């Protein structure tokens, strides 16, 4: 026991006997250790602050990116709608132009056809009196000898060629006899009271009529049946001389 107390006293004495230089060094070491701890603490705080700033910056950057992406999407959507509208307008214009051109083509074609028909009608109308003369000659002239028969056949051959030419042009002859009178086709130049035909029936063609397609070149001049005069028939039946 006495030995342990002696050892402790010896250590305390050694400590007390340290030189001022040693004490100063130890003090400096302790100060530097304290400074290092404080520096490490500040560094940790700085690192934490930097991490927070980085996270905040990243979050802000993401938000900006999202805003920019949304704006870009909306811009593209607007451009798409505008392009779609312009495309529809162009398609509509194309259809209108196509319809206008088609109408123009049809109108031009119809005008051309009408002009061709008008010229054709005018030319044929000039030939119809010649046809009439040939038909009158055929009806009234009766060849009396071989010479006259040869002449008759010669001009009848010309007449036939003209009729065939008219047929090729689309001209057709009216056959009104026995039909009901139609003012669109016929011209009544004579009327005859008769009980043999219904009233309004064409009983004779006096001048031939012609049609080109659906157009009347010349109305047929006809004689039309009318109802008999019953009073005149009664007088004839009661006349003593009959």
From Swiss-Prot:
Residues 1-10, 21-32, 40-59 have a biased composition (Polar residues). Residues 11-20 have a biased composition (Basic and acidic residues). CDD domains: GrpE (cd00446). PROSITE patterns: GRPE. GO terms for molecular function: adenyl-nucleotide exchange factor activity; protein homodimerization activity; protein-folding chaperone binding; unfolded protein binding. One of its GO terms (cellular component) is cytoplasm. One of its GO terms (biological process) is protein folding. Residues 1-64 are annotated as: Disordered. It is found in: Cytoplasm. Keywords: Chaperone, Cytoplasm, Stress response. Participates actively in the response to hyperosmotic and heat shock by preventing the aggregation of stress-denatured proteins, in association with DnaK and GrpE. It is the nucleotide exchange factor for DnaK and may function as a thermosensor. Unfolded proteins bind initially to DnaJ; upon interaction with the DnaJ-bound protein, DnaK hydrolyzes its bound ATP, resulting in the formation of a stable complex. GrpE releases ADP from DnaK; ATP binding to DnaK triggers the release of the substrate protein, thus completing the reaction cycle. Belongs to the GrpE family. Homodimer. This is Protein GrpE. It comes from Trichodesmium erythraeum (strain IMS101). The gene is grpE.
């Amino acid at each position: 026991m006495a030995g342990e107390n002696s050892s402790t006293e010896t250590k305390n004495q050694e400590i007390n006997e340290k030189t001022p230089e040693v004490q100063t060094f130890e003090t400096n070491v302790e100060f530097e250790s304290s400074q290092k701890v404080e520096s490490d603490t500040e560094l940790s705080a700085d690192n934490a602050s930097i991490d927070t700033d980085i996270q905040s910056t990243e979050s802000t950057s993401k938000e900006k990116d999202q805003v920019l992406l949304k704006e870009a999407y909306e811009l593209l959507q607007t451009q798409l709608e505008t392009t779609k509208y312009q495309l529809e307008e162009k398609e509509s214009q194309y259809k209108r132009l196509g319809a206008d051109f088609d109408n123009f083509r049809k109108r031009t074609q119809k005008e051309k056809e009408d002009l061709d028909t008008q010229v054709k009608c005018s030319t044929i109308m000039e030939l119809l009196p010649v046809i009439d003369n040939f038909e009158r000659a055929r009806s009234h002239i009766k060849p009396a000898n071989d010479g006259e028969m040869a002449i008759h056949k010669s001009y009848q051959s010309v007449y036939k060629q003209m009729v065939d030419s008219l047929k090729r042009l689309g001209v057709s002859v009216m056959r009104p006899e026995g039909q009901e009178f139609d003012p669109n086709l016929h011209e009544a130049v004579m009327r005859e009271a008769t009980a043999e035909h219904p009233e309004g029936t064409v009983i004779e063609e006096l001048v031939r009529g012609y049609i080109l397609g659906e157009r009347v070149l010349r109305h047929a001049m006809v004689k039309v049946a009318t109802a008999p005069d019953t009073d005149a028939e009664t007088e004839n039946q009661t006349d003593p001389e009959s």
